[in-house]
Design a protein with these regions (language model features):
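Short acidic/glycine- and proline-prone juxtamembrane loop motifs at membrane-interface regions
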Residues: 196-210
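Membrane-proximal stem/loop segments at transmembrane-domain junctions that anchor or position
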Residues: 108-112, 297-393
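Membrane-interface anchor segments at the N-terminal boundary of transmembrane helices
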Residues: 17-20, 24-25, 29-39, 150, ...
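Extracytosolic helix-loop segments that constitute the early lumenal/periplasmic catalytic or substrate-binding loops
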Residues: 96-120, 126, 325-330
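Transmembrane-helix motifs of polytopic, lipid-linked glycan transferases
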Residues: 154-178, 216, 424-430
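Short hydrophobic/aromatic helix or loop-helix immediately within or flanking a transmembrane segment
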Residues: 100-103, 117-150
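Start-transfer (signal-anchor) and selected internal transmembrane alpha helices
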Residues: 1-82, 277-282, 483
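Transmembrane-helix signature of polytopic, membrane-embedded enzymes
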Residues: 167-193, 439-442
Length: 488
């Protein structure tokens, strides 16, 4: 039964992912087939590396292997940090507002003059608290949050650490799941060549700072499925729930991993143990979420103007229900035309219902496909928006600024690399239909599927998928290697 369920999942994933890949190629605003051809060449090169070059690393002793890997990672980290400093940008949009609000938090231990913003954009509160704690430490060295180069330097450092931690966790997962030195090396190379990691290195925002938490949840699950002792299994399930909560507090979409974990618990063990693990996960998540909400209500924010300012979550679903699914000033003004939160919910629910009722089945399919392509088919993940406001002039402007000589080659490289990853993920899923795999690989696949479904309804932006790119890179690496027998 479990084997059949795995086959059905991977078959469904193939259909959905294949449709996204196909439409990403033919709807790309430039030459999609050319980028696909380059992506196929890159995939062939990665396959050749995984077959004939990297397996030689499996013969190294653990001491020599660690020396090689740690040296390579240290060089990568140094280059990554240097690039982040060169790419330093003037914060824009909500990132700028969050940074501007931090002195209020640091001065009072809560938000006073900025309470109104966090009533409206409560989703950014977790980001503000994370940055606030980090800038408190930076303040010990005389650094304060502002839009200057020295003011953003601590944020850039935190972001670099988060991205490097994500790469390290991904390599650790490759070791745990795929077992070999070659698998770790392949995963590391896929990450090192993934340009959006470099491009987002100076942008300390929720898309990057939430990334390690999803991987920690995946790592906890990988350890959970191997643990025989009941108490430790429950502790690991609770740890996974805690990791999901902290990721969710920074970026709400991370919560889909909790649903994927619940599904995997029941696929991995008997119902009694699965229920116990699910209870531990929900208890950890629920206690943390409840405490977080209570802290907001009791201390962090002045909620006096809640009825006048608060925006219900339905607004973002309303944005995602028409046109290209992006921000709509008309929706926002309609929501603010009524006086209470309850009235806004009712009004927005009516607008959402009316928007979807206006589509024929074919129109709805076209609309959802268009949203999926915007979200999953952009090789830059909207990085160009943040890089368009550099702090100072340097040689990187030759490729990060639109209209410069290196900009279009960068765009084509990023798109070709995305197509390579998409093709490898599709190939791995197709192989999993014939030889079903579960465990962390299936958890990654179910999590990506959950995000696809969620973002088909939510406001549409390519960067909203960015914090799940490590899951795609893990699936791509696994597609190039034979899965261990125990994972099947």
């Amino acid at each position: 039964m479990q084997k059949r369920l795995k086959q059905l999942f991977w078959a469904g994933f193939c259909l959905v992912w294949g449709w996204i890949v196909l439409n990403s190629v033919f709807r790309w605003r430039h030459n999609g087939p050319a980028a696909l051809a380059v992506g196929a060449v890159l995939a062939a090169g990665a396959w050749a590396l995984s077959r004939w070059v990297l397996p030689r690393l499996n013969g190294l002793s653990q001491r020599r292997w660690r020396a090689v890997f740690y040296t390579a990672f240290a060089l990568y980290a140094a280059a990554f940090a240097a690039m982040a400093w060169l790419l330093a940008e003037v914060p824009i949009m909500d990132q700028a507002v969050v940074l501007e609000s931090l002195p209020d938090l640091l001065a009072h231990g809560r938000f006073s003059v900025w309470s109104g913003y966090y009533i409206v954009c409560n989703n950014n509160l977790g980001l503000a608290l994370l940055l606030g704690g980090w800038y408190w430490l930076a303040g010990l060295f005389g650094l304060a949050p502002d839009a200057s180069l020295t003011g953003v330097a601590p944020g850039i450092a935190l972001n670099v650490l988060a991205l490097l931690a994500s790469v390290a966790l991904l390599c650790l997962l490759a070791r745990r799941i795929l077992k070999t030195n070659a698998a770790v090396a392949l995963t590391f190379l896929l990450c090192a060549a993934f340009a959006p990691f470099w491009l987002y290195s100076p942008c300390f925002y929720s898309d990057t700072l939430s990334m390690p938490f999803g991987l920690l949840a995946l790592l906890a699950f990988e350890r959970w499925r191997r643990e025989a002792r009941p108490a430790r299994r429950l502790a690991l399930a609770a740890g996974a729930g805690a990791a999901v909560f902290f990721g969710y507090a920074v970026k709400g979409s991370v919560v889909v991993i909790a649903v994927a974990l619940a599904i995997q618990f029941f696929l991995q063990t008997n119902p009694r143990r699965a229920l116990a693990s699910l209870a531990a996960l929900l208890a950890a998540f629920g206690l943390l979420a409840g405490g977080y909400r209570l802290w907001q209500r009791a201390w962090l924010i002045d909620w006096t103007d809640e009825e006048a300012l608060a925006l219900p979550v339905q607004l973002w679903f309303c944005y995602g229900s028409h046109d290209d699914g992006n921000y709509s000033q008309e929706d926002y003004e309609a929501a603010m035309s009524v006086d209470t939160v309850a009235e806004r919910k009712t009004l927005l629910n009516r607008r959402i219902t009316a928007n979807y009722a206006a589509y024929s089945p074919l129109e709805l399919g076209e609309f959802v496909t268009r949203k999926a392509v915007i979200t999953w088919g952009d090789g830059l993940y909207n990085a160009e928006e943040f890089l368009a406001t550099p702090q100072r002039a340097n040689w990187t402007h030759a490729f990060i600024l639109e209209g410069q000589p290196g900009y279009m080659p960068l765009v084509y490289y990023c798109q070709a690399y995305l197509f390579m990853v998409q093709l490898l993920v599709l190939a791995g899923a197709a192989r999993a239909v014939r030889r079903p795999v579960g465990g962390p690989r299936m958890l990654a696949g179910v999590s990506v599927t959950g995000l696809i479904l969620f973002l088909s309804l939510w406001e549409t932006k390519a960067r909203y998928a960015f914090n799940f790119t490590p899951f795609l890179l893990l699936l791509a690496a696994a597609a190039l290697l034979e899965p261990p027998a125990e994972e099947s």
